């Protein structure tokens, strides 16, 4: 038996990460064979509560079957598992107070300059504009936008990141195979293709009042900074802000109109010590060296649509049809943008439908 298989099994029977790691650490500390986990009285040893110990006793005999079913399930949906024991487990998460023992991953879990965006599920037009403005300004740098793919600010943040060809990671409050809300199915697929969707919950887990607060610690834990865009007085995003502060992350809040219910939470965060996010420099100051990564001055004159096309060509997606597919737009519209970029001397045509960057 492998240590990671034990963690996957415990996760599958709904053990918390804390209890899963307690069980594994006890076996390792006592130099006991992993295969004997079911023979131990974890209740007597005060490792587990009676409820958890009973669940372990009841399900221990299903170990092989559960591991087999999990393996079949994730293979069928293009998901892989990363445990806290693995080298490719995110370092950002490894050292938080309650790290997830298991992560189900759909996509490529690459993380650089991670920044979380959280906020109200119902939001104002100001919140929409704030997300667009901030993420548009981040497009000149290699940021990873982390959020929760819920209604509202989460969805806006992921979509704007994708539009700007920024890496994005969605942390679910459900199992990796449960899309919530269902209306975000297309977004789920696009994030999986161009970034990553992750969950600590076993496949099939439905949304409930406990899963979303639990996933908030992962959103903040993955990130170096957290931006709260809009929040009512009792908003769940304030939980993420609190967790971020406890994890030593910097918390930004977008200042809002004092008469708006959607800005009560963010304004109070600022009053209590969060950094008011007024301009993009406020964020960049917390990512030393990012300005030296690449000189993007020549891109500044491009509008958002031109930038989206430019970024694709720069990545090697230089065929007109492929650009249309990636940006989900019609050929005639993309051709107009390509022509504008040609006239600006930024790209050139190298074949009937292919282009390359000139500068």
Question: Which residues does each predicted region cover?
Answer:
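Glycine-biased, small-residue-rich flexible motifs in mid-sequence functional cores and linkers
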Residues: 1-2, 81-359
């Amino acid at each position: 038996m492998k240590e990671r298989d034990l963690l996957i099994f415990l996760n599958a029977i709904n053990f918390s990460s804390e209890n899963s790691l307690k069980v594994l650490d006890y076996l390792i500390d006592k130099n006991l064979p992993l295969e004997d986990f079911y023979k131990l009285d974890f209740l007597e040893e005060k490792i587990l509560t009676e409820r958890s110990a009973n669940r372990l006793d009841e399900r221990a005999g299903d170990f092989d079957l559960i591991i087999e079913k999990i393996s079949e399930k994730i293979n069928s949906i293009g998901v892989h598992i990363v445990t806290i024991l693995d080298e490719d487990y995110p370092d950002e998460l490894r050292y938080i107070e309650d790290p997830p023992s298991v992560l189900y991953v759909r996509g490529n879990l690459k993380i650089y300059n991670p920044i979380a965006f959280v906020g109200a599920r119902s939001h104002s037009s100001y919140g929409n504009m704030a997300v667009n403005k901030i993420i548009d300004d981040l497009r000149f740098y290699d940021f990873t936008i982390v959020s929760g793919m819920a209604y509202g600010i989460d969805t806006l943040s992921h979509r704007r990141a994708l539009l700007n060809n920024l890496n994005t990671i969605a942390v679910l409050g459900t199992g990796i195979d449960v899309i919530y809300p269902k209306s975000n199915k297309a977004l789920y697929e696009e994030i999986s293709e161009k970034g990553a969707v992750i969950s600590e919950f076993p496949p099939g887990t439905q949304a409930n009042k406990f899963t979303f607060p639990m996933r908030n610690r992962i959103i903040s834990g993955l990130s170096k900074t957290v931006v709260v865009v809009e929040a009512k007085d009792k908003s769940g995003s304030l939980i993420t802000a609190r967790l971020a502060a406890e994890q030593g992350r910097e918390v930004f809040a977008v200042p809002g109109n004092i008469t708006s219910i959607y800005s009560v939470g963010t304004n109070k965060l600022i009053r209590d010590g969060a950094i008011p996010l007024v301009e993009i420099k406020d964020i960049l100051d917390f990512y030393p060296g990012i300005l030296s990564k690449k000189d993007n001055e020549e891109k500044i004159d491009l509008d958002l649509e031109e930038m989206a096309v430019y970024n694709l060509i720069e990545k090697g997606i230089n065929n007109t049809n492929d650009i249309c597919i990636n940006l989900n737009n019609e050929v005639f519209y993309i051709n107009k943008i390509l022509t504008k970029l040609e006239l600006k001397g930024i790209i050139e045509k190298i074949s009937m439908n292919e282009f390359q960057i000139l500068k």
